[in-house]
């Protein structure tokens, strides 16, 4: 009985194995489904990649705009820095030039006092006494005149000019009015008398002339 069962089982094994073997049609269908799934994933990935460029392009445009603004701002700052540097250079140069021109201003003011004394001394010498029979006074007067002429040459050499504006129009920047008086034959507003001469150093009033001004009668 047992032997008969064994023989029956051996006859049934090939048929059972054949029934368990996978069907080619099923394998093909499974393969197609698998490939379809892969293709779908690839298509979705490609779609996402195609959707990325617009976002990247927008980002690049924003970066470009930002960089252009930064460049413009940097250029403006550079231009302002250049302008400030040039202004500073010009101011420094002007200060140096003014120092050269007006550095002797205080010294000149002191020398003006000496020039005033020489002028007064020359004016005080009685002209009628200057004769050959009075050689001492004559020599003294000539010495004073020569000294005054020489000091005026030195003043001119260094840009210091005398202001003796008799008959000129009154200028408040160069003259200081001590009094106003009507003078016949003189135009009102002009200088009638110079009490003390003034001086200008390189065009700048160092000391105004003290004057009397003509006014209407």
From Swiss-Prot:
Keywords: Acetylation, Chaperone, Mitochondrion, Transit peptide. It holds the Pfam family GrpE. The modification N6-acetyllysine is found at residues 94, 100, 215. GO terms for cellular component: mitochondrial inner membrane; mitochondrial matrix; mitochondrion; nucleoplasm; PAM complex, Tim23 associated import motor; TIM23 mitochondrial import inner membrane translocase complex. Residues 1-27 form a transit peptide. One of its GO terms (molecular function) is protein homodimerization activity. One of its GO terms (biological process) is protein folding. The keyword RNA-binding does not apply. Residues 30-39 have a biased composition (Polar residues). Residues 29-56 are annotated as: Disordered. It is found in: Mitochondrion matrix. It comes from the Eukaryota. The modification N6-succinyllysine is found at residues 94, 120, 215. The keyword DNA-binding does not apply. Essential component of the PAM complex, a complex required for the translocation of transit peptide-containing proteins from the inner membrane into the mitochondrial matrix in an ATP-dependent manner. Seems to control the nucleotide-dependent binding of mitochondrial HSP70 to substrate proteins. Probable component of the PAM complex at least composed of a mitochondrial HSP70 protein, GRPEL1 or GRPEL2, TIMM44, TIMM16/PAM16 and TIMM14/DNAJC19. Binds to HSP70, HSC70 and HSJ1B. Belongs to the GrpE family. This is GrpE protein homolog 1, mitochondrial. It comes from Homo sapiens. The gene is GRPEL1.
């Amino acid at each position: 009985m047992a032997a008969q069962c064994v023989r029956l089982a051996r006859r049934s094994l090939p048929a059972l194995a054949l029934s368990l073997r996978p069907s080619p049609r099923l394998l093909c269908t499974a393969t197609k489904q698998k490939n379809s799934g892969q293709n779908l994933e690839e298509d979705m990935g490609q779609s996402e990649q195609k959707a990325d460029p617009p976002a990247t392009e927008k980002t690049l445009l924003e970066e470009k705009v930002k960089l252009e603004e930064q460049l413009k701002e940097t250029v403006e700052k550079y231009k302002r820095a250049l302008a400030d540097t040039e202004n500073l250079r010009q101011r420094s140069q002007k200060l140096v030039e003014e120092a050269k021109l007006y550095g002797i201003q205080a010294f000149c003011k002191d020398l003006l006092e000496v020039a005033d004394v020489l002028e007064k001394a020359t004016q005080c010498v009685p002209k009628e006494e200057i004769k050959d029979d009075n050689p001492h006074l004559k020599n003294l007067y000539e010495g004073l005149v020569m000294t005054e002429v020489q000091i005026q040459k030195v003043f001119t050499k260094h840009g210091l000019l005398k202001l003796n504006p008799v008959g000129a129009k009154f200028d408040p920047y160069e003259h200081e009015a001590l009094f106003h008086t009507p003078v016949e034959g003189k135009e009102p507003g002009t200088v009638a008398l110079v009490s003390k001469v003034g001086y200008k150093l390189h065009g700048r009033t160092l000391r105004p002339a003290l004057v009397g001004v003509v006014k209407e009668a």
